[in-house]
């Protein structure tokens, strides 16, 4: 009987122990699930914080380095070939934006863990709710600000408007005036519908001037400076034909799809703004606006020998495809020039060749071209490129601002080159076009 009583007590104790173990196990599971839930929430909000900080830092970095650019410009640059890009710009973004955003996000995690240990459960729960709300609100505000700053929604609306001119080699209409679908302010005259002829035609020298605008003129001539930084170019403009948006010296007003180098080249070359789908075509099918008829195509049909000369790499942003697929016979870029010439370190910059050296070599190329018959020599400068431009050994130290000295140097270089052209036998039968590719991206201007 005693044994049965003892056995019953043992069974009872075992049941109690089993119940306690189950309760303990359930409690541990709840704690584990709670910890897992908190970890997931912490991870989610850390990612949101990272995106938030990344957006903020990116906005600041882009504004400081490129000024008021738009979303399509950023997207086109990311999608198009980047060979020849100034690596200092890439490293600057990695360090100042990505790394800084990552470090601040890690500090956020440590801050949350510190508050969790120091605050009571009730206080921490309140802080967690308020913090989560604040994070979501700031993310929404960041997204709204980014859209307002870069016209992201407008870009997608713009992209939804289609035209075959970018990607099909065919006539779209046979009307005299063909409207380009994509911007109601643009009336596109299809060159396929126009008879272009002429026997006594001129040679063409077409020079894209990096980041040139009338800001650097004095107020008397249409700029904002007390002293004219471009006296030589001012005289050239006054003595020859110039086009302006005002009664003073000015120029074309840029619009969507024309405000960075390859976009400006494309719009001047084709009469059309650049769209991001062109970058997709380059990436997928290795082609650049096969549906457009360009200046290069027209001159090629009329027997011109055509050459492009640039101090950077021709592959950048698809420059080689734009010109070689539309009538040009040759491109001289930094790589091909290095094979033919040797350069000193003070003749090079982060993008390639200094402009003074480029103008020297341009004289050799034009002299050879002039012996072949009618020619189109196109070139692009680089020294005024953002954010600070590139000083060369000929740049004056006239102004306190480095950028103004570079523009003054450009004015002298271009004027000297024009003087050389005037001394050549082919000058009287040559049209020279000087045009800024886009407004400067340097923030102070």
Where are these regions (language model features)?
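Solvent-exposed, charged interface segments at domain starts and junctions
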Residues: 87, 95-131, 168-186, 231-246, ...
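Transmembrane and membrane-interface helices of multi-pass
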Residues: 1-3, 11-12, 18-166
């Amino acid at each position: 009987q005693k044994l049965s009583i003892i056995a019953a007590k043992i069974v009872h104790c075992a049941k109690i122990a089993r119940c306690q173990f189950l309760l303990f196990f359930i409690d541990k599971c709840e704690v584990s699930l709670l910890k897992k839930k908190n970890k997931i929430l912490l991870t989610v909000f850390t990612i949101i914080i990272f995106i938030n900080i990344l957006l903020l830092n990116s906005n600041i970095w882009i504004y400081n380095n490129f000024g008021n650019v738009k979303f399509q410009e950023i997207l086109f640059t990311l999608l198009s070939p980047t060979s020849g890009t100034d690596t200092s710009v890439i490293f600057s973004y990695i360090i100042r934006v990505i790394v800084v955003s990552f470090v601040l996000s890690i500090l956020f995690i440590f801050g949350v863990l510190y508050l969790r240990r120091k605050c009571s459960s009730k206080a921490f729960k309140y802080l967690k709710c308020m913090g989560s709300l604040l994070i979501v609100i700031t993310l929404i505000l960041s997204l709204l600000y980014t859209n307002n700053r870069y016209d992201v929604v407008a870009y997608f609306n713009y992209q939804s408007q289609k035209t075959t001119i970018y990607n099909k080699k065919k006539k779209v209409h046979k009307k005299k005036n063909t409207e380009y679908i994509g911007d109601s302010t643009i009336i596109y005259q299809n060159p396929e519908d126009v008879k272009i002829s002429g026997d006594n035609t001129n040679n063409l020298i077409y020079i894209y001037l990096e980041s040139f605008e009338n800001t650097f003129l004095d107020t008397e001539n249409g700029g904002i400076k007390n002293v004219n930084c471009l006296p030589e170019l001012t005289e050239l403009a006054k003595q020859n034909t110039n086009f302006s948006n005002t009664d003073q010296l000015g120029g074309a007003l840029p619009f969507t799809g024309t405000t960075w180098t390859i976009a400006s080249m494309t719009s001047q070359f084709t009469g059309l703004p650049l769209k991001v789908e062109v970058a997709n075509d380059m990436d997928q099918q290795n082609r650049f606006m096969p549906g457009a008829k360009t200046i290069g195509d027209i001159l090629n049909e009329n027997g011109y020998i055509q050459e492009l000369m640039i101090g950077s790499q021709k592959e950048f942003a698809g420059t080689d495809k734009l010109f070689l697929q539309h009538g040009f016979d040759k491109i001289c870029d930094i790589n091909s020039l290095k094979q033919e010439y040797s350069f000193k370190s003070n003749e090079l910059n982060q993008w390639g060749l200094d402009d003074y050296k480029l103008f020297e070599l341009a004289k050799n190329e034009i002299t050879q071209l002039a012996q072949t018959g009618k020619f189109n020599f196109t070139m692009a400068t680089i020294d005024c490129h953002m954010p600070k431009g590139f000083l060369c050994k000929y740049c004056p130290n006239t102004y306190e601002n480095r950028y103004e000295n570079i523009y003054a140097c450009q004015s002298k270089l271009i004027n000297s080159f024009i003087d050389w052209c005037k001394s050549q036998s082919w000058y009287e039968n040559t049209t020279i076009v000087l045009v800024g590719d886009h407004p400067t991206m340097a923030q102070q201007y």
